[in-house]
């Protein structure tokens, strides 16, 4: 299984699409990409995690660190997770919910919703 992070820009937002397993081995890759994006001057970041099918505590740690970094720049971080809810939604959503940190993040059902200003985040 290949872990991949691809990036692009849409207006003021940097978008990182993540796929594969987000774990102890792969989480440093995502951490570095987030740091690179912020170092390039992007303070609005969408992390598309809809293709991440496994996430362990180190992956959650990277998400929390990304939130802290973006907030320190007065930026905005939005996560994209499939909109099926915490109960039967993505593995990442279930892990965030189980660890009690889901409420820390603005979560959207797809990238277009995350990029829009009128869409409300999905409820935790």
Model-derived features: positions:
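STAS-like cytosolic regulatory interaction modules
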Residues: 1-53, 65-124
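Helical "lid/switch" subdomain of P-loop NTPase nucleotide-binding domains
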Residues: 58-59
């Amino acid at each position: 299984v290949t872990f991949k992070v691809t990036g692009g820009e849409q207006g003021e937002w940097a978008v990182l699409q993540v796929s594969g397993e987000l774990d102890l081995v792969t989480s440093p890759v995502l951490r570095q990409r987030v740091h690179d994006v912020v170092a390039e001057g992007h303070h609005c970041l969408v992390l598309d995690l809809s293709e991440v099918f496994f996430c362990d505590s180190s992956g959650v740690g990277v998400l929390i660190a990304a939130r802290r970094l973006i907030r320190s720049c007065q930026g905005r971080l939005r996560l994209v997770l499939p909109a099926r809810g915490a109960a039967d939604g993505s593995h990442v959503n279930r892990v965030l919910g189980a660890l009690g940190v889901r409420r820390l993040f603005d979560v959207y059902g797809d990238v277009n919703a995350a990029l829009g200003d009128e869409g409300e985040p999905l409820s935790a």
